[in-house]
């Protein structure tokens, strides 16, 4: 059609959503992350959860806004949540990650291909992982230390560069 689409390439958006590719990027960027597994069935999910130790975060891959994300504390929870996830994203894998108690932080960043501007680091009000897509956040973050904000900003810059975010 002759129309140039500006922005991050589809390949890099896919890399951000693909568990294995994103893990490779995090490794290259030296960014820590909780242990996790990619699974396809309830049995695999329960096995992964037991290996990681409860609680775990169970969520579909390739779903925006935290839809279908649940914190599981037992095999029964995993079984129930897999049923919900399969209704939302049947053709995609399921991610089972060790749940880390803490705060959920959201970062907005703008990049022109070279310079990266981080206008805000927001702090979610609810417990991490509960309502990621519809939660309330506050800016500026109220209880995040300056050191943590600096680390978050540095990790954001590393990821923006690695993913060629534009």
Where are these regions (language model features)?
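N-terminal beta-alpha lobe that positions the nucleotide/phosphoryl donor
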Residues: 1-166
